[in-house]
Amino acid sequence: MELLPRRQQEVLQATVHHYVDTIEPVGSKTLVQRFGLQASSATVRSAMGALEQKGLLVQPHPSAGRIPSPRGYRHYVDCLLPKPGAAVHHLEQELTQLSLRWAALDDLLQQLTRRLTDFTGLMSLITLPQPSEQRLHAIRLVPTDERLLVMLVADSSQTHHLNLRLPHGSVHQVAALERWTDDQLHQSGQISWESLPQQLQTCGQALREALHNEEGRFISPSDQSAHVHGVSRLVAQPEFSDSTKVAPLLDLMDCNPAAFIPSGPGHDDWVWIGGEHPHTALSDCSVIQSSYRDGQGGVGQVALVGPMRMAYATARAAVQCVAKHLNHLLS
C-alpha cells in the first residue's frame, strides 16, 4: 500500500473520525477547526483533493464536502488505526468477572455477544468452536480426452483429486461450470446445486454426484452454529434505510449467519471492508473478525458487523479482547 505524505495521513484520519461521529461530509475549514490541524484551510483542501484523486476520499454531491471511500477506510485500518481507548481495558476487566458466572458454553457466548453489541453498538456474532475439518475453498476442472480431472482445494490450501468420466458432448461446459462453482463458494461457502443453470446440467450433475461421495471430507459453513445479537442495531443504521440493502442481510441471517464470517488462511484476525467480503449481501458493510480455539482443537470466530462507517479501533480491540478471553477460558 502506498505510503501517504504526513499531511494527507492527518487529513484522511481526521475525515474518517469526523464521518464516523457525524455521518456528514466534511470540508477543509471544519477539519482545521475541529481537529486543530496545523495547516491552513487551503493546504488541507489541497490534501483532500489529492486524497480524492487517489480514490481514498469521495464527494457524494457536487456541493458537499468529502467522505471516506472503501479504499480510504482500508488505508485507515491498515496504516492509521489509533490505539483503543481506556474503555477496552475496562471491557477486559468486566469479561474477567463475567467468566466466573457461566455454566455452559452457549450461555457464555450469548452473554458475550450481548456485551459486544452493548459496547460497540454493532451486530455481534460468535460461532461455536468446530472441529478442524477442512472447508472446500475452490474447485478446479481440467478436461483431458474423455476424462475430467477435478481438484478440490481446501481453505488450508491442501488439495484432493478426483478423476471422472466426462459426459459425452459436455466439454464445452467445463469452464463455465468452474466459474459457477467459484461464485457459489465465494458467496456462501457451499454449492447450491438447485440453482445450477440448465446449460450446465450434463457436466454439473456428474460433478455433483462425485462431490456427494466426498462430502465427509469437508464441512459446510451452514453446519456451524452462531450466537447473534444486535440485528436491530445494524438495520437501524442510516446506511440501511434503503430496504433493498437490508433484505439481503436479513435473508442471509435467517439462512446462514455463519456466512457473515469467512474462514480460511489469514482470516484469524481480519477486517473486511465493503466489497472485499466474499458475500455480496455484505457489500455495504464491514466485518471485523478474530478466531479463538478450545482445548480440543476446535475453532470458533468472534465478529462485529456494521456499516463501513464505524469506530474501527474500538471495534477491532473489542473483538480481539473477547477472542483472547475465550482462548484463555477454553484452553
Curated annotation (Swiss-Prot):
Pfam families: HrcA. GO terms for biological process: negative regulation of DNA-templated transcription. Keywords: Repressor, Stress response, Transcription, Transcription regulation. Gene3D superfamilies: 3.30.450.40, Winged helix-like DNA-binding domain superfamily/Winged helix DNA-binding domain (1.10.10.10). One of its GO terms (molecular function) is DNA binding. Negative regulator of class I heat shock genes (grpE-dnaK-dnaJ and groELS operons). Prevents heat-shock induction of these operons. Belongs to the HrcA family. This is Heat-inducible transcription repressor HrcA. The lineage of its organism: Bacteria, Bacillati, Cyanobacteriota, Cyanophyceae, Synechococcales.
